[in-house]
Amino acid sequence: MEKTSVLIKSKELMEIYELKDGVPYFKTYLSGQWISGDEWQDVISPIDLNIIGKIPKLNWNQIDDTLEHIYRKGRWSIRDTPGEKRLDIYKKMASLLDKFKEDFVNVLMINNGKTKSAAEGEVKAAIERLLRADLDVKETRGDYVPGDWSSETLETEAVVRKEPVGVVLSIVPFNYPLFDTVNKIVYTTVIGNAIIIKPPSSTPLPILMLAKVMELASFPKDSFAIITIPGRDMNKVVGDKRIQAISLTGSTETGEEVVRNAGIKQFIMELGGGDPAIVLSDADLAWAAQRIAAGIISYTGQRCDSVKLVLVEEEVYDTLKDLLIKELTKSVKVGDPRDPLTTVGPVIDVKTVDEWEKAIKDAVEKGGKILFGGKRLGPTYIEPVLIEAPKETLKDMYFYNKEVFASAALLIKVKNIDEALEISNSRKYGLDAAIFGKDINKIRKLQRFLEVGAIYINDYPRHGIGYFPFGGRKDSGIGREGIGYTIQYVTAYKSIVYNYKGKGIWEYL
């Protein structure tokens, strides 16, 4: 295997790091300044666990100064930039992402362990999200409220404005560092908020490159910053009163920790998932098997909307099981994501694979039967696993109760849709679900009772750029992400009431 290293060809992007002994030391961006560090954090490729770069480990004084600058100046700089200009900036960012596409694809492959097609897909999605910011604009409009619906408010009227809350902290996950950051930038700043971005410690490089793109696109320099500190040091930041809203994509445990420490703020959180796929007796089984297999193995299961439970009506269980095993056998090729034949690359780190192994052992000890995969092929490489799980012990299994961020699915035979509903809804998570079948009455009942944020009919769950809103119920999140839908969580409503009593403007009957 060829040793991993960061390959950046664009001169503009090469300005954000210095090579020392062959290792790139990246700077971070704090409100108009590129900052190096007194301390450094290693960035490790999941492909071979090689150190591919170092990023600054900021201290509290640096973060405090940045918060103060953005609170005092930056939140007004972005608000005073006309909306038309903000849209132009997004378009420039999209153009620059396209210009630097090769560099971003290479870094996503090396830093995230993504296959080339997956990395290209993320860059494409980021570009499309920037270009579709115009669809968010209509949600920045306010309302007019007449006063003649109450005797107390006769001869008055009000305008209800939607205003930016001020400063938004955006905490980005490791799995889609470029797209998720772009998405958070658009819905946060399109209405005029300043943004502070906390990149994932494991995959920060695409975000630091994006900061350069923002600078080149003339994004208001005082209005954004990238704070590179470990997640364990974030409690003081999330609790800071200068931050008015927090946007987080991450685990349920991280979300709970943020809520405990943040105080009174607005939240938008997309948290733990791992979705059920329900297969009805009249489903197109070949199609269902193909789509479910894709939902299990896509990005090695490191997606919040990855398929983790497969619930199959007993009449077609054996057939679906055989077809699913065949699809996995045909689809899975584990290896170096730089190899164009690879379909399943590495998991992000060793500890996640350790947890995956532990969960498999737990499932087998509780009566589970491995139908496919389940082998560890290296420190960060796995064979996606399919486990036949008995209903009697299912709810005691680690995989059922905890989202494991690697390819794994439990296959369960159910008598009917009521049993499928009970098993699905008994989990603490409620992000998405998939239903495969034709019976509209069964599908309609499942739609009504599934406690999830989105349901995909005859396909596996995937959120894309957010044309359709998504988000979790129960422990899977707060609020909804989606084009035009998320602005409400980073918005303050302000009612401005005009009193015209006795001015002769209205003559009521």
Swiss-Prot record:
Active site: E270, C304
CDD domains xref list: ALDH_F11_NP-GAPDH
Amino acids binding AMP: R79, R86, R161, K162
Enzyme class: oxidoreductase
Domain of life assignment: Archaea
Entries under Pfam families matching the protein: Aldedh
Catalytic activity: D-glyceraldehyde 3-phosphate + NADP(+) + H2O = (2R)-3-phosphoglycerate + NADPH + 2 H(+); D-glyceraldehyde 3-phosphate + NAD(+) + H2O = (2R)-3-phosphoglycerate + NADH + 2 H(+)
Positions with a binding annotation for NAD(+): K198, S251, G272, E403
Binding site residues for beta-D-fructose 6-phosphate: R79, R86
Function: Catalyzes the irreversible NAD(P)-dependent non-phosphorylating oxidation of glyceraldehyde-3-phosphate (GAP) to 3-phosphoglycerate (3PG). It is highly specific for D-GAP.
This protein's name: NAD(P)-dependent glyceraldehyde-3-phosphate dehydrogenase
Biological source species: Saccharolobus solfataricus (strain ATCC 35092 / DSM 1617 / JCM 11322 / P2)
